[in-house]
A protein has these predicted regions:
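Generic structural signal for well-ordered alpha-helices
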Residues: 2-3, 66-67, 108-116, 145, ...
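Active-site-adjacent "subsite" loops/lids of carbohydrate-active enzymes
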Residues: 2-3, 19-71
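Aromatic-lined carbohydrate-recognition surfaces of secreted/lumenal glycan-active proteins
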Residues: 6, 11-21, 78-85, 99-142, ...
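The substrate-binding groove and active-site-proximal loops of carbohydrate-active enzymes
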Residues: 46-60, 97-106, 172-179, 215-221
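Short, acidic/polar
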Residues: 56-70, 136-148, 222-239
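Alpha/beta enzyme core
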Residues: 64-79, 83-86
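Glycine-rich, proline-tolerant flexible connector loops at the mouths of alpha/beta enzymes
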Residues: 81-102, 165-166, 170
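Substrate-binding cleft of secreted/luminal carbohydrate-active enzymes
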Residues: 152-166, 175-271
Length: 271
């Protein structure tokens, strides 16, 4: 399959759902979050299981999977769900490894550092909550933009307008304002990274943004106009810093995408 995709000039990314995992908890329940009230494996609002973000063996397992994917010829590994759980009865969670004293942002940062240390030459990327672009307190999930940036080839903030809270930058329903939401978020993110790179004393970082955009109906109907608005907002936000532009991606959980929002690129050497 990888060869076929490469033959079609397709860049192949393998995505790993890291700490939200529906198989590893069954094989290694000792590494999973569990319920303090029932003693069973804890599940979020969707009935999904989670691993302890601080468990070293969970880090080892996911990094080993990433190495195998790269060894099999994939161009990049994308790490998703690189965070603490955020939905469900969080007060009922017991962590077998996290001491509940170490900052969540430091736990996740150390995992990111470990990824880069173990995969120094392979291309890796990470998905972050969209609000991480403007927030610096970790959002309760441990994600911090400046902590993630040095360790990945691409950072993918999920700046879905529907996921922003009512009243965000004055919009009662942010989903109705895709350009404004994405532009504001990426403007702030770019400013933060420019400042980070200016203060770096090591070799210049080569990381880039490659955000996820909304192509699904939530909060508003997402047609070609709204999808294009996000793309335009991103291009406008990155216009002054093309070195940070790593492209963009669309997300639809049903894999049904708005073709009219996309433009065909010219085929190389075409007549």
């Amino acid at each position: 399959l990888v060869k076929r995709l490469h033959d079609e000039n397709i860049y192949v990314i393998g995505r790993i759902a890291v700490f939200q995992d529906q198989r590893l908890p069954l094989a290694r329940p000792d590494l999973a979050l569990y319920s303090s009230s029932t003693g069973q494996i804890w599940k979020d609002n969707k009935g999904l299981m989670w691993m302890d973000t601080a468990a070293p063996e969970v880090w080892d397992y996911n990094i080993a999977v990433a190495k195998e994917l790269l060894a099999r010829g994939l161009d990049e590994v994308n790490f998703d769900y690189v965070r603490f759980a955020s939905d469900g009865n969080l007060n009922d969670i017991k962590h077998p490894f996290w001491d509940e004293k170490t900052l969540k942002t430091h736990i996740v940062r150390d995992f990111f550092d470990r990824i880069r240390a173990e995969i120094p030459d392979g291309r890796v990327s990470a998905d972050l909550f969209g609000l991480v672009t403007i927030n610096k307190d970790g959002l309760g999930i441990g994600q911090h933009l400046e902590y993630a940036w040095p360790d990945f080839d691409a950072i993918a903030p999920m700046v879905y307008p529907s996921h922003y809270f009512p009243g965000f930058i004055g919009f009662e329903n942010p989903a109705d304002y895709p350009y404004e939401i994405v532009k504001y978020s990426m403007d702030v993110a770019v400013k933060r990274i420019v400042a980070l790179q200016a203060s770096a004393s090591t070799t210049p970082m080569t990381d880039r943004f490659r955000p996820w955009f909304q192509d699904f109906n939530l909060g508003a109907t997402y047609d070609a106009v709204k999808v294009k608005a996000q793309i335009q907002a991103y291009e406008d936000a990155l216009a002054g810093h093309p070195e940070l532009d790593g492209g963009w991606m669309l997300w639809n959980p049903s894999n049904i995408y708005t073709k009219d929002a996309l433009e065909e690129e010219p085929i190389a050497n075409s007549q």
